[in-house]
Structures are given as structure tokens and as C-alpha cells.
Amino acid sequence: MFRNLTLSLADITGEDYIRGLVEGCEFFGTLSRGDADALAHEKISFYPEAVQRRNDELAASVGRQIVSAVNDSNGGAPTDAFRHAENRDASPLGAYGCYRLGEDGKLYLIGKSEHYHASLGHSFPGYRLVDIARRLGVPNATHNNTRGYITRLCEKR
């Protein structure tokens, strides 16, 4: 089993930053001080044992037909070169952990980086921290000359 981290936004960013977020929520009227503080300190389990077990169980189903295939002729509007290279059968219909259900109804293993989050897996429970940050008013703008606290913190780590 993997070591499961359980952290809050406050654990990651520190109390000084959280105090500013909480006061900002109160000023903007988006959350009460108490609600904002509770959200900032909510512990999120990054990779709970139940998720680990489910990922292990799904391995036996890789390559098998799981759901009915999507029989849709929607090819979008790609370039000819892209249309020739794409694999619509494997296009994601749904995903969980390191698995993806293709439009052909088969289960695929993410065996290589499909995107930046592949190492975390689809539906990574730790993404709840992003939802919490958004509710607390953390902006997602990260312009070069006004990089936010969290961006600067990540640069150092």
C-alpha cells in the first residue's frame, strides 16, 4: 500500500496566508469567518485505502469490454493529419485512478503520460483542495509579475 497523505490547505500554505483568505471571504461576503476557517482546515485524504484497493481491483479488467460502445459518428472538426492519428475508440468516456473507459467500452490503463495529471490519476481525491481554494477566493490568475502565494510556494518546493 501507498502512504496516504491527509492535509488541509492550511497545512500546505500556513496560517498567515489562511488568515488573509478568511478575512477576504468575510470582506467579500462570500463565506462567514467560521465557515471559511473550517474549509481552510478541512483535512483531505489524498489516496485513501478504499481508492487504493479499487485501483488494484480494476487491473484485472484492463482490455475487457466493460460498457456498451458509443456508436457516435461525431468526428469533430480536426485537421486531416489529426484525424488520421487519433484513436477515437480509446477516447475517454469515463475515468478513475489510472484507468480510462474508452468510447469503445473497453478499460484502458494509463501506461504513459496522457496529460499533466496522469501520475495522480483521474478523480484524484486531493483535487478537493483545489475546490476548497476556489471557494476561499484563491484566484487562478498567475501572471508573471503577480504570481500568487501558492504559485510562489510551489516554485520553492
Residue ranges, per PLM feature:
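N-terminal glycine-rich, Lys/His-bearing helix-loop that initiates the first secondary-structure elements
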Residues: 1-157
